C-alpha cells in the first residue's frame, strides 16, 4: 500500500507494510492473514449496504452482522481501495483470542435456587438457551444428554457447518463412535469448551447429579471457534460471527439466551471502543439475552504498565524485560492525543535505538519506522485517533532477524513536553504467547482484564477462590483504563472447579474461564424466573445485570466496588 488510510487500525497498517517473511514471525501481526490466497480476514464498520461492497469487490467475501458490522475476507491488494469506500467507516484486523483456564455451585447460592420450587418446578434453566462459544464440546458426554439418551444440544455449529438436534441424535444412535463422528464430526481436543459447558448447564448424569451445572435443564447452542484457515487459533472475527449466529437462532426459536465467552486478548485501549467491543455492546440490546465474558488470567503476568505523566517531571523510564528464546514481542503504548510526549527506545546495552519527537501538529502520524539492533528488528507504527478511538496508539513489533529477539532489559523513556492529562498505558500481547520472564519490571496490577470483557453492555466476570472466600490472584483486574468504568462487574468461583471432560468423566480446572459459566447459568435462571414464569418480562440485558449486581456480596476485605472483584461475588438474587 502506498497510502495509509486513517480508517485502518494500527496493527493492520503495520502488518500490511511488512514483507511476508517478517509478518510470519509474529502471531499477533499475522492474525487473519491467509498466505495461500494473500488475503486478510477483517472487521468492518459500514454505513450503507454490504451488497454495494460485494459488487465492487467480487473477489472478496463479506458476512453481514448486526448494526452495520461486517466480517470479510479481502485480498491484500484490495484493502486500500476498500478503505477508500465512503460507506466503510473503519477497518480492524482480527486478533487472536485465548482461553482464561460442585463447590462453585454451592458457593454461588445456586444450589438452594435449584431446589426451590416455582409453579412449574425448580429453577433449572428450562426453556432458556445457554450458548457456549468455545473450543467445541464432547456431545457424547452423559451430562449433555437427556435420560432417554437424546441430546440436549439444540444446535451445534463447527467449521462452517450447522448440525441440528435431530442430526446429533442420529449420530448418538450410531453403532460406534467412529460412525457417529462421520455424521457429526465435532470434537473438543482441549476439553475447554466441554468443561465450560458442564459448569453452565451440565445435568450431572455421569456423576449421579453430584457435578451438576447451574442451568442443568437449559437447551444448548454450541459454536466451535477456530478453523483450518486461522491455523486453529480462534479470531475475533469468528467470535463476532458466532455471537451473531446465536442471536439469530434464539430469535428464530423465540427463546431467551445466555451467552458464555471465556476468551480474550490484550489488544486495545481497554476502554470499550474497539469494533469488537462496540459490536458486543450493541448486539446485547437486540434480543432477550445476556452475554457473560471472563476477564482473563493476566492479573499477575506483568504484561501491563500504566500511570500518569506530570508536566513537572522531566522523564519516565519504563523497563521491559525480554526473556531468552522469545520469538516476537508486540507492545502497545496508549496515551491521550492532547498530551505531547517524546519517546526514546534504549536497547539492553542502553544505546539509543530511536527517538520519536511528538508534534503538536501531528507530524509523523500514520508513519512506520523500522530499526535494527543486533539480532532484533523493531518496527514502530505511529497512529492517530480514529472515528472510534480518541486515544493515540504507538505500536511496537520486536521481531528476530534470525531465531530470537535479543534478551535483556529494553527501556522506553517518556519525555513529556505538553501535558493536559498525562494518562498512559502499555500492554504486551496475551501471556500465553510469551515466555515466563518477559514482562514489565514495574508492572501495574490494575487494568489487567482482557478485551472484550471491557465492553460496556456485557457482564464481565472475574474469579475468586470459594474455599478461602478470597480473590483469585490470577484473575484480570479493572477498572477500565481512563474511563474508570467498574470492571469486572462481579466475580464467581474460579479455583479448582470440577466439571465435564471429554470421554465422559470429570476434571478439575481453574481460571476465569471457569468462573464465567457460573454467571452465564445464573443469567439463564433469572430469565426463566422472570420471562418464562411471568415475574419480570424484561429480565434480560442491562436489567438482568442490575439484578446480579444488586444481589452481589463483597468478599472479606474487599471494598465495593473493587478493581479486583467489582461489585462482589455472584450470589444470585433471592427470587421469592
Question: Could you describe each region identified by the protein language model?
Answer:
Residues 1-120, 128-129, 142, 562:
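Autoinhibitory N-terminal propeptides
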Residues 32, 252, 256-265, 283, ...:
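C-terminal subdomain of the subtilisin-like protease fold in secreted/lumenal serine endopeptidases
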Residues 117-237, 254, 326-329, 338-339, ...:
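Subtilisin-like serine protease catalytic core
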Residues 118-125, 145-147, 211-215, 233-258, ...:
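Mature extracellular/periplasmic domains of secretome proteins
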Residues 134, 296, 511:
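Active-site glycine-centered loops adjacent to acidic/histidine catalytic or metal-binding residues
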Residues 157-174, 301-402, 414-415, 439-524:
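Extracellular S/T/G-rich loop segment that most often corresponds to the catalytic His/Ser-adjacent loop
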Residues 197-200, 221-229, 245-258, 340-342, ...:
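Hydrolase catalytic cores
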Residues 420-431:
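Edge beta-strands of jelly-roll/beta-sandwich modules across compartments, strongly enriched
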Amino acid at each position: 500500500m502506498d497510502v495509509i488510510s486513517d480508517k485502518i487500525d494500527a496493527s493492520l497498517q503495520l502488518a500490511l507494510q511488512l514483507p511476508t517473511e517478517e509478518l510470519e514471525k509474529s502471531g499477533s501481526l499475522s492474525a487473519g492473514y491467509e498466505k495461500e490466497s494473500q488475503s486478510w480476514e477483517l472487521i468492518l464498520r459500514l454505513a450503507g449496504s454490504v451488497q454495494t461492497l460485494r459488487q465492487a469487490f467480487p473477489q472478496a467475501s463479506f458476512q453481514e452482522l448486526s448494526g452495520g458490522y461486517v466480517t470479510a475476507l479481502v485480498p491484500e491488494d484490495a484493502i486500500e481501495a476498500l478503505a477508500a469506500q465512503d460507506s466503510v467507516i473503519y477497518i480492524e484486523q482480527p486478533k487472536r483470542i485465548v482461553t482464561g483456564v460442585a463447590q462453585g455451585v454451592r458457593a454461588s447460592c445456586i444450589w438452594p435456587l435449584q431446589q426451590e420450587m416455582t409453579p412449574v418446578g425448580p429453577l433449572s434453566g428450562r426453556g432458556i438457551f445457554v450458548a457456549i462459544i468455545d473450543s467445541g464440546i464432547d456431545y457424547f458426554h452423559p451430562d449433555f444428554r437427556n435420560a432417554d439418551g437424546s441430546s440436549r444440544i439444540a444446535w451445534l455449529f463447527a467449521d462452517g457447518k450447522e448440525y441440528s438436534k435431530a442430526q446429533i441424535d442420529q449420530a448418538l444412535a450410531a453403532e460406534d463412535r467412529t460412525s457417529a463422528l462421520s455424521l457429526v464430526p465435532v470434537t473438543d481436543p482441549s476439553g475447554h469448551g466441554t468443561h465450560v459447558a458442564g459448569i453452565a448447564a451440565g445435568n450431572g448424569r455421569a456423576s449421579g447429579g453430584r457435578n451438576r451445572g447451574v442451568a442443568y435443564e437449559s437447551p444448548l447452542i454450541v459454536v466451535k471457534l477456530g478453523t483450518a484457515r486461522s491455523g486453529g487459533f480462534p479470531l475475533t472475527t469468528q467470535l463476532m460471527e458466532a455471537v451473531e449466529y446465536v442471536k439469530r437462532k434464539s430469535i428464530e426459536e423465540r427463546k431467551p439466551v445466555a451467552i458464555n465467552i471465556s476468551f480474550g486478548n490484550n489488544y486495545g485501549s481497554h476502554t470499550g471502543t474497539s469494533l469488537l467491543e462496540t459490536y458486543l455492546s450493541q448486539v446485547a440490546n437486540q434480543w432477550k439475552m445476556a452475554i457473560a465474558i471472563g476477564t482473563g488470567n493476566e492479573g499477575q503476568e506483568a504484561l501491563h504498565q500504566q500511570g500518569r505523566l506530570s508536566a513537572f517531571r522531566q522523564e519516565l523510564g519504563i523497563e521491559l524485560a525480554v526473556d531468552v528464546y522469545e520469538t516476537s514481542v508486540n507492545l502497545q503504548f496508549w496515551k491521550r492525543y492532547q498530551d505531547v510526549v517524546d519517546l526514546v527506545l534504549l536497547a539492553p546495552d542502553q544505546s539509543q535505538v530511536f527517538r520519536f519527537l511528538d508534534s503538536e501538529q501531528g507530524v509523523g502520524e500514520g508513519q512506520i519506522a523500522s530499526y535494527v539492533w543486533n539480532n532484533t528488528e523493531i518496527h514502530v507504527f505511529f497512529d492517530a485517533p480514529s472515528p472510534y478511538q480518541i486515544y493515540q496508539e504507538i505500536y511496537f513489533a520486536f521481531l528476530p532477524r534470525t531465531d530470537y529477539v535479543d534478551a535483556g532489559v529494553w527501556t522506553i523513556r517518556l519525555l513529556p513536553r505538553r501535558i493536559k492529562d498525562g494518562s498512559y498505558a502499555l500492554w504486551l500481547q496475551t501471556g500465553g504467547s510469551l515466555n515466563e520472564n518477559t514482562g514489565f519490571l514495574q508492572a501495574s496490577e490494575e487494568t489487567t482484564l482482557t478485551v472484550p470483557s471491557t465492553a460496556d453492555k456485557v457482564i464481565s466476570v472475574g474469579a475468586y477462590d470459594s474455599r478461602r472466600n478470597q480473590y483469585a490472584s490470577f484473575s484480570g483486574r479493572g477498572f477500565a483504563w481512563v474511563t474508570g468504568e467498574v470492571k469486572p462487574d462481579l466475580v464467581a468461583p474460579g479455583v479448582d472447579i470440577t466439571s465435564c471432560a471429554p470421554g465422559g468423566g470429570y476434571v478439575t480446572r481453574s481460571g476465569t474461564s471457569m468462573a464465567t459459566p457460573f454467571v452465564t447459568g445464573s443469567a439463564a435462571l433469572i430469565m426463566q424466573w422472570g420471562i418464562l414464569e411471568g415475574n419480570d418480562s424484561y429480565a434480560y440485558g442491562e436489567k438482568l445485570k442490575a439484578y446480579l449486581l444488586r444481589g452481589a456480596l463483597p468478599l472479606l476485605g474487599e471494598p465495593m466496588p473493587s478493581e479486583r472483584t467489582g461489585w462482589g461475588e455472584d450470589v444470585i438474587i433471592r427470587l421469592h
